[in-house]
Amino acid sequence: MSNEAKCPFHQAAGNGTSNRDWWPNQLDLSILHRHSSLSDPMGKDFNYAQAFEKLDLAAVKRDLHALMTTSQDWWPADFGHYGGLFIRMAWHSAGTYRTADGRGGAGEGQQRFAPLNSWPDNANLDKARRLLWPIKQKYGRAISWADLLILTGNVALESMGFKTFGFAGGRADTWEPEDVYWGSEKIWLELSGGPNSRYSGDRQLENPLAAVQMGLIYVNPEGPDGNPDPVAAARDIRDTFARMAMNDEETVALIAGGHTFGKTHGAGPASNVGAEPEAAGIEAQGLGWKSAYRTGKGADAITSGLEVTWTTTPTQWSHNFFENLFGYEWELTKSPAGAHQWVAKGADAVIPDAFDPSKKHRPTMLTTDLSLRFDPAYEKISRRFHENPEQFADAFARAWFKLTHRDMGPRARYLGPEVPAEVLLWQDPIPAVDHPLIDAADAAELKAKVLASGLTVSQLVSTAWAAASTFRGSDKRGGANGARIRLAPQKDWEANQPEQLAAVLETLEAIRTAFNGAQRGGKQVSLADLIVLAGCAGVEQAAKNAGHAVTVPFAPGRADASQEQTDVESMAVLEPVADGFRNYLKGKYRVPAEVLLVDKAQLLTLSAPEMTVLLGGLRVLGANVGQSRHGVFTAREQALTNDFFVNLLDMGTEWKPTAADADVFEGRDRATGALKWTGTRVDLVFGSHSQLRALAEVYGSADAQEKFVRDFVAVWNKVMNLDRFDLA
């Protein structure tokens, strides 16, 4: 008998057929339980912000400057300088960000993990991170990988003569991959038009995706699906970069600025390249893409398959990209690897070789580079940058800072001595609090006035929820701070019930004005604080209605943003298309409503128990959009009871879909057939899904009322303060 057959661990945990294999459509709650303390080696007492603030950032930068020109034989530096490689590393770390759900980006150092560490577009960035390991090892916990990747990109630019806009630390590492939807394709770089294509109709890209192919960060540099058409490529570029929060000017600046440096690599056929890191053998120690082409490195390196050096100054900031773009006519050719690229017609060989100082090459460009000349809007910007180098430098500096900091959230999270003083609109700025805050006695007085104003528990709770639940843990945007719910576009969102919202805000503003006018010594309450405080008052009243005396925690300190401080277009991506906590769907979607609920809960950083108790509480408090009765399983509305769970789990009720809408259900008395309740998929999933039913049973038990109230108050307080980074 073989040793393998004798192994007592043949059925080791995790090796068998999984639930997902048996039931691929089962609702997956695992995304709610990522990044727990169990996967974090730092320990519960470690505070990364405090560690970073003690870091000698200047010393780190000196070490990075030295690294740039210390070429290693195992992966030699192009032109004797690693700047181009490290710019690409930082760019690709940040460039996964997409505006639709705020996921991706540099904020967690996810480039270290699958799938990103093995995406074709990230080929050989494993070497860049290995080059950085001695510096990461030296400074240890004081600088995260997430911060180091971006800082290295900045230093790369600075070491080649470019003045950056600034750098902010504060990106704490995570220790496992994010579960992010990157597309449905089953093949790397699969072209559009297949059964799993991300495109439909007239090349309409699926939301929330931004990249054009599975395994790419942005667009295909050879053109759409490899078609070398610069004008068609411009359409892809505009769509993709817009989905990554960049306008046309920022897009041109980033492409031209980034392609001022370094080169691409396509010395030979891609068939020579080995497996990516996650598929490589254990002896490779996490490195991938081992090439059998000649030496496999340096002048023989194969990465994208393209062989392009854009400028005569690949290790120095210049304006040569635009000089070449407009100074030559271009003809289509192929790289040694067979990839479509462009070469300057009749040009002299003026481009330096990366490793042989005696060799020169003709200027070359990518299809997507030529888009900056042949798309009319891009050309106009490009010519202006060509004629005004200082505008180009400023635009690139600002766009690079935005690219590398877009997912960090508000400036309150920025750390370090290089944080720029200028406040930028895309940071969703909120004024600093410049007055004394209310105390506990003031809060009690204000709550009493709110409850005496005629506003209902439902109105108070739903308004506070609408303000706070815009928060996204992905890119740290949204939340109640700033009171942007009173501004465009939030005040007009369908989910926020504009007519009711306007009436509630008018009442709260009158209470606020009267209170502030009666104060001495400058004490004030902001509308942002009052919206949250009013919601807390509503929860307390609802608990009282259910026979429980509770005090909901409240921390003042929010401020009110102005319309001028609010980018309406940028803010629009926060509009909920689905909010299961309010039983709201803006339209009909292919994705089931319960999946959208879990997605929303994950963006709110909720666990499955938190999601469960929160939804059950909001139902009985009447927080549904449009005062819908779906899921309001109680006769004691606006009382904080566990009735949602009690009645959902009642075996005396039989559920069937309605004839009019298969996603809406009627609950009828099993004996009489009398209609008792109506509910949606989001409601019924707490009785049908085995894990969620187990949680519902906890809160539906006879002894659960007190625990239900306590747990609801805790998670309510959590959501109200998700954007209060000043309290951390």
Curated annotation (Swiss-Prot):
UniProt site (Transition state stabilizer): R88
Functional note: Bifunctional enzyme with both catalase and broad-spectrum peroxidase activity.
Reactions listed under catalytic activity: H2O2 + AH2 = A + 2 H2O; 2 H2O2 = O2 + 2 H2O
GO CC term (a single one): cytosol
Cross-link for Tryptophyl-tyrosyl-methioninium (Tyr-Met) (with W-91), residue positions: Y218-M244
Gene3D superfamilies named among the record's database cross-references: 1.10.520.10, Peroxidase, domain 2
Similarity annotation: Belongs to the peroxidase family. Peroxidase/catalase subfamily.
Protein name as annotated: Catalase-peroxidase
Catalytic center residues: H92 (proton acceptor)
HAMAP family in the record: Catal_peroxid
EC number: 1.11.1.21
Record's comment on post-translational modification: Formation of the three residue Trp-Tyr-Met cross-link is important for the catalase, but not the peroxidase activity of the enzyme.
Keyword field: Heme, Hydrogen peroxide, Iron, Metal-binding, Oxidoreductase, Peroxidase
Species this protein is from: Burkholderia mallei (strain ATCC 23344)
Oligomer status and interactors: Homodimer or homotetramer.
